[in-house]
Amino acid sequence: MKLIYGESDVKKLKIRRIIDLSAGLAVSVAFFVIGAFCAVRRWEIGRSSAYVLSALSGGVALSLLVGTIIFYLHHTKLLSFVTQSLSPSKKISGTVTDVYNKPANKDGLMFITALISCDDGIDRYLYLPEGATVPEKGTKKIYYVIHNNYVCGTESEAENE
């Protein structure tokens, strides 16, 4: 059995990446500003507490910046893998054998699941977002498999991916 994800998952992954990177950079910049402010105050006043605060803020800012860069590289690698795999690789013919109308929670997202018995001998799950048109049980149709993780219903859907 292979898991099939839709294009909405890819969009949500991209949005999540932007939010995470923005938050990481914002916090890192905030600590850099605090560190710079403390360093300036240290020179003006000559207080040791400002020196400690500036060193701590600089260390935290540097750690957050490095963490954000690592996080960015991880997301970029993940997104490039997903983007590479979004080209149609093969057509398969399959029959919907079962539809589970009760929404399932998959990676924090709610999906309606359909089990497709494909002619290539592999049963695949098709995850549909809530509100999508659910195929009827017994429907035989040509599906376009994209990197074994995503199935489009029509050729135009596959080309648009």
Description of each model-found segment:
Residues 1-5:
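Short, charged cytosolic
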Residues 7-83:
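Alpha-helical transmembrane spans
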Residues 84-105:
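Structural detector for short beta-strands of small beta-barrel domains
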Residues 89, 109-111, 139:
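A general secondary-structure signal for short beta-strands and their flanking turns/coil
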Residues 102-117:
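Short aromatic-glycine-enriched beta-strand elements
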Residues 126-161:
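A membrane-cytosol interface segment of integral membrane proteins
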